[in-house]
Each structure stands twice: as C-alpha cells, then as structure tokens.
Amino acid sequence: MEAFTRLDAKAAPLPLANIDTDQIIPKQFLKTVERAGLAKGLFYDLRFDEQGREKPNFVLNRPEYKGAGVLVAGDNFGCGSSREHAPWALMDFGIRCVISTSFADIFYGNCFQNGLLPVVLKAEEVQQLMDEARGGNHVVSVDLEAQTVTSPSGAVFRFEIDPQRKDKMLRGLDAIGETLQSQKDIDVYEMKRALAQPWLEGA
C-alpha cells in the first residue's frame, strides 16, 4: 500500500449528502477483484448519461477539476452496502483523500486498508473548503503528520485520527503489510510447531 504523508492537490466539491457505495461504484463494476480500471465506474450514474456520454456539469467532468486528488463531500459519505471497490475506484481515479463531516463506519475502515485518507471536519470547515474549491484556486494541502488541512486561502483546519491508523497510513501498511512486520516471529512459530507436531506437516 502506498504511504500517505502529505498531499497538495486540487479539491473537487461534491455537496451531496448520503452518497452511498452504489453511487460511488455501481454493482455492474463489482465483477472484478482487480483494482486497476475501476475509475471508469466511479460515480458512473452521476458522471454519464444513459448513452454513456459525460455530463458536462458534473464536477469531476469539468476541466478545472481534472486531476483532482481531494474530494470534499457531503455528510454521511460512503453509506450503504460494504464494498471495498468503493475506495478502490476513488484511488484508481486519482483521489487520495476524501473530506466530509462524517463517513459510514465500514467505508471509513476500508479507506485506511487501501491508502485513501478519510478526513472528518466540522460542517463550517467543510463548507468553507467547498466554497473555496469553487473559486479560481482549487489546491488544498492535507498533512497527515500534522493532522491539518490547509484551504486554498490559507485557513488551517485540524482533524482527529486514531493513532494506530495514522501510523499505518504514514508507513503504508495494510492488514497484510502489518502481518508481515511479524514475519520473523511467524517463522519461529512455524519451526517450533513443525518440531512439536511433525504429523501436521503436509496436512
């Protein structure tokens, strides 16, 4: 998993509450376990019309937000069914951080397992970021080490994060990476078990 330390990127405002995982990545794109290529399904029904043409007014289709790395979203982002494809699609599109006033619990946890940073700010702070992102300067700075978000105008907002999750994001550790940190202990255990219970070998 790619580590997250600091991000300076365009911010795209999506002032819609209760965006669920089916809106983030519709069910027809869930047939794969490959992460690459899921960007095409991100917000599909919001980004495209029935003929598959881009809707020019949707924020991520507008030229000034092309290449956005931060999404500033409405309340309760990521609600609905559990699907790890949701953070995968956001990441594949180039989004590394989502800022909202709240996230659904399962989506929030899935973000940390995939290198996508979910940031919770106060309602007035999220609104200010959205307002500023609609202006001419869209660049927002997210500093995980300092736990701050700096708006285009220079306003600094502090966010809270679980220390263990923060450490794993800074080091780029998902669940597998965290387990591999104990590889030596695992190897020692396997050797001892093989000596004590040789009949289990090859079972």
Swiss-Prot record:
GO biological process: any one? L-leucine biosynthetic process
Question: Which GO CC terms are listed, alphabetically?
Answer: 3-isopropylmalate dehydratase complex
The record's GO molecular-function terms, alphabetically, read: 3-isopropylmalate dehydratase activity
- InterPro entries xref list: 3-IsopropMal_deHydase_ssu (IPR004431), Aconitase/3IPM_dehydase_swvl (IPR015928), AconitaseA/IPMdHydase_ssu_swvl (IPR000573), IPMI_Swivel (IPR033940), LeuD (IPR050075)
Which pathway does UniProt place it in?
Answer: Amino-acid biosynthesis; L-leucine biosynthesis; L-leucine from 3-methyl-2-oxobutanoate: step 2/4
| Statement: the UniProt record of this protein carries the keyword Lyase | yes
Q: Which reaction does it catalyse?
A: (2R,3S)-3-isopropylmalate = (2S)-2-isopropylmalate
- The answer to keyword Amino-acid biosynthesis applying to this record is yes
The EC number on file is 4.2.1.33
Could you tell me the keywords of this UniProt record? Amino-acid biosynthesis, Branched-chain amino acid biosynthesis, Leucine biosynthesis, Lyase
Which NCBIfam families does the UniProt entry name for this protein? leuD, PRK01641.1
The UniProt entry's sequence similarity note says: Belongs to the LeuD family. LeuD type 1 subfamily.
Oligomeric state and interaction partners are given as: Heterodimer of LeuC and LeuD.
Function according to Swiss-Prot or TrEMBL: Catalyzes the isomerization between 2-isopropylmalate and 3-isopropylmalate, via the formation of 2-isopropylmaleate.
Q: What is this protein called?
A: 3-isopropylmalate dehydratase small subunit
